[in-house]
Every structure is written in C-alpha cells, then in structure tokens.
A protein has these predicted regions:
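Gly/Ser/Thr-rich loops at beta-strand to alpha-helix junctions
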Residues: 38-40, 95-99
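Divalent-metal-activated hydrolytic enzyme cores
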Residues: 1-29, 64-69, 81-84, 99-180
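Ordered, amphipathic secondary-structure segments that act as subunit-interaction surfaces
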Residues: 82-94
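Short secondary-structure capping micro-motifs at structural edges
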Residues: 74-81
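Conserved beta-strand-loop surface patch within small alpha/beta domains used
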Residues: 15, 19-74
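Short beta-strand segments
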Residues: 34-36, 60, 92-94, 167-170
Length: 180
C-alpha cells in the first residue's frame, strides 16, 4: 500500500495537484480541533464543521483525548496557542467510538499473539509506564469530553482567554452536540 501511495504522490506533484491546497501554517480561524483518529471522521468532521484547508489545526488521536496534562495532544495544543495564534479549542468526540471500552487486557492478548514478550511488557512497566492506564479507553463519552475540556482549561500553561468547548459529533450524520 505504501508503495502505491508513493507512486500516486509522484503523479500528484508532477501534475501540481498541491496548488489548490497552498496556505500558510497559521490557522485562518485561530481554531484548534482535538478529535479522534477514526476514519469515519477524516472528511466528515471538517465538512460538518464548515472547515476548509488552512482554517484550523486539527489534532487527532485515539479517542480525541488529553489523557495527561503533558501528553502529546496537550503539547500540540500549547504549540497551537503560542506559535500558531490559536484562540479557541474544540474537543470533538464522536458516537460509536472504538476507544470507548478499550482495555489493556485486550491489547495484552493482541500484543502477545503478535510476538511482543511478557519480558518486554514488564520492562516497560519497570520504566514507570502504567500500560493499563495508557491503553485504557473510556466508559462514558460525554464524561471523557468533560475531563479533556477541564484538563485543557485548567492547564497551567493555557493562558486566560482561550475558549475551550466540548462536543460529540454523530459519526454518521455529522450532527454536532455541545456537551461542555
């Protein structure tokens, strides 16, 4: 698959397909969106929000969560605020999310089946990584949105005046419901 993508890319560049996407690094709407990496949202999310190329910084991860105050999603939001002029943040979870009810136990069995050893997992734990917490999903989507919004709003590096709001998007219709 990757080789096919590389071949496509060569044609894309040769035909100057990139020209209609040219923009600068600053989001025109001074907006960042933290959302799930679910494939159903790849085109639906920006379309349902009326966002075009260059309008917003879109940060995606499993579940659209900030799981700790200094994880990579939070780091990206801090960079968006201070380096890219973001003034508003939308946290957008979605219906029927695969991160809901994720568990380390499931991942553990999958990892072992694919050749990861217990010794490797034990070494990771001895290094201070709580895999159970790190790979844990959430049970309640609105509550996960609330927690993420609160983590962002109360973060010591987020300046006063940054607007943070939380939503759930229907992953079929694109309907947006404000949660927090």
């Amino acid at each position: 698959m990757i080789d096919q993508i590389i071949d496509y890319n060569k044609t894309f560049v040769e035909q100057k397909g990139y020209e209609k996407y040219l923009t600068d690094k600053y989001p025109d709407k001074k907006l960042a969106v933290l959302s799930c990496m679910d494939t159903r949202l790849t085109e639906l999310l920006p379309a349902a929000l009326g966002l075009k190329n260059g309008d917003a910084k879109i940060i995606k991860n499993a579940g659209g969560l900030v799981i700790s105050a200094f994880d990579s999603a939070m780091r990206s939001l801090i960079v968006a605020i201070y380096e890219l002029g973001v003034e508003e943040i939308m946290v957008v979870a979605h219906s029927h999310c695969g991160a809901c009810h994720m568990s380390y136990e499931h991942f553990y069995h999958e990892m072992i089946a694919r050749g990861i050893t217990d010794e490797t997992l034990e070494t990771i734990c001895k290094c201070g990584v709580n895999l159970d917490h790190w790979l844990e999903g959430f049970k309640d989507t609105p509550e996960s949105v609330r927690k993420t919004v609160e983590t962002i709003k109360t973060h010591p590096l987020v300046p006063k005046g940054i607007v943070v709001r939380g939503f759930i998007i229907d992953s079929e219709t694109g309907a947006l419901e404000e949660i927090f």
